[in-house]
Amino acid sequence: MSKAGSDVSSISCSLSLDSDSCEDEYYETNLNKLIENTSLNWIFVGGKGGVGKTTTSCSIAIQLAKKRESVLLLSTDPAHNTSDAFNQKFTNKPTLINSFDNLYCMEIDTTFSEDTAFKINKSDFFNSIIPELLQSFPGIDEALCFAELMQSIKNMKYSVIVFDTAPTGHTLRLLAFPDLLKKALGYLINLKEKLKGTLSMLQSLTNNEMEFEGMYDKINHLNTMSISIQENFQNPLKTTFVCVCIPEFLSVYETERLIQELTKKNISCYNIVVNQVVFPLTSPDVNIEKCEKLLKQIKDTNIQNSFNSLILKAKELEDVYISRRKLQSKYLTQIKNLYGNYFHIVCMPQLKTEIRGLDKISNFSEMLLQSKDIPIYST
């Protein structure tokens, strides 16, 4: 953690869209500024698997639907939990979510093979003349499909799109695609310039002028598209990332890793949602020792035995509760120390039931807008 932790201190104030300087910015412990920021077009929600990304992205989309003209919730997670979350079947076509007139959802295949017009086709002249490209740049075929997909998403007429992303590792691969495309297409463009004379001769010999021109057009189109996507990713007025985690070692570690990659790629990130947090009990404190003293004054053995059993169970529950609070506080303290000066950190409580269905997601979404102190345990 130490190396990544030391790198976090280098994150500049520019990560926040709302501040002119670190000193002047107050980082609220809610997502109000994210929801109220009407300039954003793309909001990515990511983190380790099983930390509540889908619940958080659905909740953000619901709140945005109250402020924006049209909202699309787009799942790139292979598990596609959005259908389960809303108890409604979604496909790779935008579908209106029940009870809304401006909130849509779609689930796309993360291989991108069925969701884009781009296909790697061996008979295609563009691909057959440069097979080395696909070997020299592993993942370029998926990156090209991703570029086509993002371009089609960019052309969608929604006010804002919320991306429910796959777990961290897959998300980092997606974030690397624009750089991979830039490198691969730069190689192609240089190759085209170097072989211009040879290709012209080939054109006259093979009578393939139209195919060569088509290849040039395709390279230029992909290059323009790649630059456009990267510019959109790196524009903090249009794109931001919301990190989701829970107060446990692996989740905090992956969050740190994700934030470092986002920082390296100049992608805005100024919100962290910490789910499954155990907050202090709101019920009145019960002094178990005092209860034990009072119990000794009761002469009835049956009542004493019943209360003794109850006190033992209470002690067990208290031990579990305190242990959990202490463990979580260790990681909440790390989160606060690492990111407290640069991020809106929103702690969400551990709930009694799973969050499924519109009513429960709506309630959860309201809680994202309520400020809550980071609950560090102290004896």
UniProtKB/Swiss-Prot annotation:
The keyword Heme does not apply. It comes from the Eukaryota. Its EC number is 3.6.-.-. One of its GO terms (biological process) is tail-anchored membrane protein insertion into ER membrane. GO terms for molecular function: ATP binding; ATP hydrolysis activity. Pfam families: ArsA_ATPase (PF02374). Belongs to the arsA ATPase family. ATPase required for the post-translational delivery of tail-anchored (TA) proteins to the endoplasmic reticulum. Recognizes and selectively binds the transmembrane domain of TA proteins in the cytosol. This complex then targets to the endoplasmic reticulum by membrane-bound receptors, where the tail-anchored protein is released for insertion. This process is regulated by ATP binding and hydrolysis. ATP binding drives the homodimer towards the closed dimer state, facilitating recognition of newly synthesized TA membrane proteins. ATP hydrolysis is required for insertion. Homodimer. This is ATPase ASNA1 homolog.
